[in-house]
Amino acid sequence: AVLGSGARVFFLAKAEIEKWPVFGKLAKSGGTLFIQRGSGDSIKIREQITAFLKQDIPVLFFPEATTTDGSKVKKVHGRILGAAIEAQRDVQICLICYVNQQGGLDQVSPFIGNISFAEHVKKVLEMPQVTAHLVALPAICTAGHTVESLTALVQQKMVQGLADLHHKVLKSQPNMQQA
């Protein structure tokens, strides 16, 4: 919601979200592209993303294929980045850091763990003030990149960018090892 609030973008999400009552319908009506992990859908989705990008319609997705607690960057799955290469469009990395009132990483805002989405929304609505810090890194030109080289570069930029963001906004620094 933080990233999608500022611009018209299409969001890439796991297929299970499409079946969620209310939120699934909202996501679908907002133009979300749903992908079934491990089903071979990634080729079809990549083609759709390429078509959107060629029309200058941004597509938002989590390259780690999940959300995290914000303490570190997980492995980037780069297959979808191939769409940006095919469409000859830059890749824009955005990082979010949720900071609680004590100046540490907030553990309620990120949708992680084994709770339902409804439970998560309830916890978010009940929590004290949290600040979402959003940073957009310089765009990465995809020209001359393979999926592998672009994935490695995105991984490196995300790790360094998150470390820099933590240094800037947190009172105490989490362990920044890559997962």
What is each of the regions a protein language model found here?
Residues E18, G40-D41, T68-D69, T142:
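Glycine-/small-residue-rich active-site loops that bind phosphorylated ligands and cofactors
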Residues E16, T66, Y98:
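Short, glycine/serine-rich, charged loops/turns that create anion-binding
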Residues E16, S39-S42, V73, N114:
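A conditional alpha-helix N-cap/helix-loop micro-motif detector
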Residues K14, I35, F62, C94-I96:
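Generic beta-sheet signal
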Residues A1-G40:
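Catalytic core of membrane glycerolipid acyltransferases/transacylases, capturing the structured
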Residues F34-Q36, L137-A143, Q156, Q160:
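Polar-ligand-bearing catalytic/cofactor-coordination segments
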Residues P21-K25, I57, S71-L153, L165-N175:
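A cross-family acyltransferase "interaction/gating" segment
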Residues I43-V59, P63-V76, L81:
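Soluble extracytoplasmic domains of inner/organellar membrane proteins
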